[in-house]
């Protein structure tokens, strides 16, 4: 019995002596490659308004991914292309059919294109992917948003062609 206590005590002390694991690294300038918006909701008449800002002097491409709160399954994703210092704004609102949708009047380029609104989808939790949760659109009414940096300029030749990246430029 004494031997077991010594081994357990040694194991606990060894575990305490190990430094903490650093799974997340924050750069000194506070900028990163992943942004998590911890909660969106359209429950009880609420809307969630958010903005994505390119703070750099270069064009930037990001993936925007919406996940429902029940099991974190994806309900919508798209790519967003921002010109230097561009701001993209949108909101998540009730879609009038028991679900939710993203609405924007912003002219920044998205793929697929979002001209005004795009509804959240239930393909990740219906059909062959059904789980123990609800399968109707009520499930997409709250969740969280992942914003992932795919690429930031400059181009290899250090150019910045606005015709490719600046959807807000009328010229």
Task: Describe these PLM feature segments.
Residues 4-6, 12-13, 19-171:
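Gly/Pro-rich, tryptophan- and cysteine-flecked surface segments typical
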């Amino acid at each position: 019995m004494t031997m077991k206590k010594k081994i357990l005590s040694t194991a606990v002390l060894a575990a305490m002596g190990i430094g903490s694991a650093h799974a997340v690294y924050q750069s000194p300038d506070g900028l990163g490659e992943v942004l998590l918006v911890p909660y969106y909701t359209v429950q009880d008449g609420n809307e969630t308004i958010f903005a994505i800002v390119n703070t750099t002097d270069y064009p930037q491409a990001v993936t925007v991914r919406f996940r429902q709160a029940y099991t974190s399954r994806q309900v919508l994703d798209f790519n967003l292309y921002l010109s230097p210092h561009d701001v993209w704004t949108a909101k998540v609102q009730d879609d009038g059919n028991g679900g939710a949708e993203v609405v924007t009047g912003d002219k920044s380029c998205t793929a697929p294109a979002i001209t005004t609104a795009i509804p959240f989808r239930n393909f990740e939790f219906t059909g062959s992917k059904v789980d123990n949760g609800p399968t109707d659109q009520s499930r997409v009414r709250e969740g969280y948003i992942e914003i992932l940096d795919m690429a930031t300029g400059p181009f290899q030749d250090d150019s910045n062609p606005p015709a490719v990246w600046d959807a807000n430029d009328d010229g």
